[in-house]
Amino acid sequence: QLAAPADFEPDDWNILKKVDNLDTDAEFLSMMTGVNITEEIIKSGEYEKYVDMISPARLVNENSVPTLLGYGLKDHLVPRELKYKLVSALEDNGVEYDYFEFPNCNHGMYRDLDMLKQFLELSLEYCERYF
């Protein structure tokens, strides 16, 4: 997972909602899930089942595959605190993982080319080792 969202709880996505001109959590969740989420679904809490289906951190279990993570510390699109939900889920379920931080990168990992090279090399090792 490279710069990808770990969870889609709408409260965490205010910047993206603003950028995409989404006025409500229902609009955001409808866009992310492909399901027509209404304000009533949100108020009832039923929206959680849809968020559960698309949020990597919520899908992790003891049978999850080893995971390689990389996040840019200057990412303006994916809230960086979300990575902790995924890391915690992996640790709580005993899933092997490696984590890379790209200190100079935003959503694309092109400002830390040495780190990107290490990440890509390890991704090939993951393919050989686990798949």
What are these model-predicted stretches?
Residues 76-85:
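Conserved alpha/beta-hydrolase "acid-adjacent" motif
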Residues 5, 74-75, 106:
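Catalytic metal-binding/acid-base residues of hydrolase active sites
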Residues 1-9:
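Active-site nucleophile loop of the alpha/beta-hydrolase fold
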Residues 68-70, 84-131:
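C-terminal catalytic histidine-bearing segment of alpha/beta-hydrolase fold enzymes
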Residues 12-59:
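Mobile cap/lid helix-loop segments that gate and shape the active-site cleft of serine hydrolases
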Residues 10-14, 80-81:
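Short, solvent-exposed loop/turn and secondary-structure capping segments
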Residues 63, 68-71, 75:
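Short beta-strand/loop motif that positions the catalytic acidic residue
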Residues 56-64, 81:
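Conserved serine/cysteine hydrolase catalytic core
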